[in-house]
Swiss-Prot record:
It catalyses: NAD(+) + ATP = ADP + NADP(+) + H(+). The gene is nadK. This is NAD kinase. GO terms for molecular function: ATP binding; metal ion binding; NAD binding; NAD+ kinase activity. Pfam families: NAD_kinase (PF01513), NAD_kinase_C (PF20143). Its main location: cytoplasm. It is an enzyme of class 2 (transferase). Gene3D superfamilies: Probable inorganic polyphosphate/atp-NAD kinase, domain 1 (3.40.50.10330), Probable inorganic polyphosphate/atp-NAD kinase, domain 2 (2.60.200.30). Belongs to the NAD kinase family. GO terms for cellular component: cytoplasm. It comes from Legionella pneumophila (strain Lens). It comes from the Bacteria. Its EC number is 2.7.1.23. It is found in: Cytoplasm. Its cofactor is a divalent metal cation.
Length: 295
């Protein structure tokens, strides 16, 4: 059995401030109050929800054996992940979203599933993030991290954009398309999947590049080594600014002639699951795959 947690930090995004999330947060506070654990909340959570728990500044998180409990959907966990990797604190999710690939625990199972986790009965896996940078010869303009994907999009353009893709300083191809999705295995069941990308097991050390509506019949998703360094050279022929987004949260302008570098972040997200969690069960359930049990 692993070490018990000493502190629980509750996290919910402001725009998810609805009755369902509020109910689960208060249910968590009531349950955690019966456990031998200190209860805190993140400052963003405190701004939108009235919980009987003190705010723990982010710079003080991770100082003890902390667990970050996210209430919301996968988007909420994506947001919390960028905070969690900076303090090396593990994360577990209560699903109040739609699909819930990352948020395992159902609201009605909070007590039965979270109790054993608090006492050290859980599975832990590491998920890597992508780090991206927008730059040119003179300056660096933006840096961000993504657990799911980094997306180059056409912004306000209504026609195809042009860019070159280099991997480890070697030219791969010139693209004319709506953009490019660069996804981790974690993100392979998100935006990349809807664009025709493959599903990758989350423990694979790989990155997938998925062109979006490419003007070429031979353009296909490309799975590469997770240690590779990727560069997108934005063609000067583009008539307007493009955009780069990280997990759909952070979005920045990319100008013609600039470059976008993408590589693995040195930190890992520590994602926890109840002991009865199985990845392929999640795929089958969330994607509606059929199952046939032999009698």
């Amino acid at each position: 059995m692993k070490r018990k947690f000493k502190r629980a930090i509750l996290y919910a995004r402001q725009h998810r401030a609805n009755q369902e999330v509020n109910e689960s947060l208060h249910r968590l506070v009531d349950f955690l109050s019966t456990q031998d654990i200190e209860i805190f909340q993140d400052s963003d959570t405190a701004a939108s929800f009235e919980l009987k728990a003190p705010v723990l500044p982010r710079e003080k998180m991770g100082a003890k054996h902390d667990l970050i409990i996210v209430v919301g959907g996968d988007g909420s966990l994506l947001s919390a992940s960028r905070m969690a990797i900076k303090v090396n604190a593990p994360v577990i999710g209560i699903n109040r979203g739609r699909l819930g690939f990352l948020t395992d625990i159902l609201p009605q199972d909070i007590e039965s599933h979270l109790g054993p986790v608090l006492n050290g009965q859980y599975n832990e896996e590491e998920r890597f993030l992508l780090h991206t940078k927008i730059y040119d010869k003179e300056n660096s303009y933006f840096e961000g991290d993504a657990l799911n994907d980094v997306v180059l999009g056409r912004g306000s353009e209504t026609h195809l954009i042009e860019f070159d893709v280099y991997i480890n300083q070697q030219l791969v191809s010139h693209y004319r398309s709506d953009g490019m999705i660069l996804s981790t295995p974690t993100g392979s069941t998100a935006y990349a999947l809807s664009a025709g990308g493959p599903i990758m097991h989350p423990q694979l050390n790989a990155i997938v590049l998925v062109p979006m509506f490419s003007h070429s019949l031979s353009s296909r998703p490309l799975v590469i080594d997770g240690e590779a360094e990727i560069e997108l050279y934005i063609s000067k022929s583009n008539e307007t600014d493009l955009r780069i987004s990280c997990d759909g949260h952070e979005s920045r302008v990319v100008k013609p002639g600039q470059k976008v570098a993408v590589k693995k972040n040195g930190n890992r997200l520590r994602l926890l699951h109840p002991l009865d969690y199985h990845y392929y069960d999640t795929l089958r359930s969330k994607l509606g795959w059929e199952s046939k049990h032999q009698g």
